[in-house]
Regions:
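Membrane-integral, polyisoprenol-dependent glycosyltransferases
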Residues: 1-172
Length: 172
């Protein structure tokens, strides 16, 4: 396989693994999953996208990004278990692609390819796409910020600004 297709292969493998798993059981039976999904549903139904609530009580234990993404998926696809898992699954796919990019930059396309595939086939990452825990999204944003800042340090001035902006945007 020509090395120019490595990034595409990593994305396709990650999509098959992570998007394929969102439609299969189990449903949102765990307490944590149900709470996260219900908070997003409450946001959608109430129209209050600023303050997460559970049973009318303000729920500020977690950052709202995950709830916003789940609520947007509910808006687009309806309120379903699989729709609640889409943001985490897409976050995992993006994390695999970003790992590929990081490896390409740091070493070579082949190294990036193996790094992206290794992450895509990692059991731990797969398990985290099955539950609604924000760890994958946090890992994605931290990795993107580190990648952006690393690229900013070694780039030309114009490129450095763009990479630094990526790093800053990923940090929130």
């Amino acid at each position: 396989v020509p090395d120019r297709y490595y990034g595409l292969i990593v994305i396709v493998v990650a999509l098959v693994i992570f998007l394929g798993c969102i439609v299969s059981p189990p449903s949102l039976m765990d307490d944590v999953d149900a709470v996260q999904a219900q908070i997003a549903r409450n946001m959608l139904e109430s129209g209050d996208w600023v303050t997460p609530r559970l049973d009318g009580v303000v729920y500020l234990e977690k950052p709202p990004l995950k709830y916003w993404l789940i609520a947007l998926c509910y808006l687009a696809f309806g309120v379903h278990d699989w729709a609640a898992r889409i943001p985490v699954a897409l976050g995992a796919v993006l994390l695999c692609w970003l790992t590929y990019q990081f490896g390409c930059w740091a070493e070579s396309r082949r190294a990036g390819f193996y790094a992206g595939l290794a992450l895509a086939t990692c059991v731990g990452l797969f398990i985290f796409t099955r539950v609604l825990i924000a760890d994958i999204l946090v890992t994605l944003t931290i990795t993107a910020s580190i990648y952006g800042y690393m690229r900013a340090i070694e780039g030309r001035e114009e490129e450095s600004r763009r990479w630094a902006l990526l790093g800053a945007a990923a940090m929130g």
